[in-house]
Amino acid sequence: MSIPTVIAFSGNIGAGKSTLLRGLEAAGYEVVPEDFSRWGQLFEMALEDPNRWKFSSQLKIMLIQSEIQRAAKKSDNRVVVLERTTECVLDFCNVAMEQGQILPAEHDMLVQIWEKVNVPVDAKIFLNTPPEKCMERIAFRGRAFERDIPVEYLSSLHSKFTRDPDYIMSGLESKEVVLANAIELIEKIVSRNVR
């Protein structure tokens, strides 16, 4: 049994990750999208009262993402494509601390937990879409819990996500071009990662 190549796409809210992952799944890749339903009530509570619940919700999301990354390493498929990583959760935590939604001590604790539970992926690809374009896409898809996101929040996240990806792809082209570019990049990564 060979070990799969685990590749994660990160990017801002509204960057085009979910659309891209649906295309990759249709192309035959094993895909694990974000599943908001697994985050449960804590996620909803954090949206309503972030100063009270942001730490707890981010901890839960980090633990779930760690489980996803661990399971991906055990897949029988040649490639597993994930939506986000535990590092992305830390990026959300960094912004939450900057906005006063979690305390520095809570942030330090999340980093310590991340150091214990993180399961590294083989490649992180950042889907680079400017915050203003993300705002347009967020408005178009109409998710209730996203309707009040300010562009400043997206700009803060964007600056965090751009810090340490292995690869950067533009999210501005048509979904067909983004998909073709992603498949080409995935296959290049897999060919370098044959075990």
Curated annotation (Swiss-Prot):
It comes from the Viruses. Keywords: Kinase, Transferase. Pfam families: dNK. InterPro entries: DCK/DGK, Deoxyribonucleoside_kinase, DNK_dom, P-loop_NTPase. Its EC number is 2.7.1.-. GO terms for molecular function: ATP binding; deoxynucleoside kinase activity. Gene3D superfamilies: P-loop containing nucleotide triphosphate hydrolases. Coiled coil: none annotated. PANTHER family: DEOXYADENOSINE KINASE, DEOXYNUCLEOSIDE KINASE. This is Putative deoxynucleoside kinase.
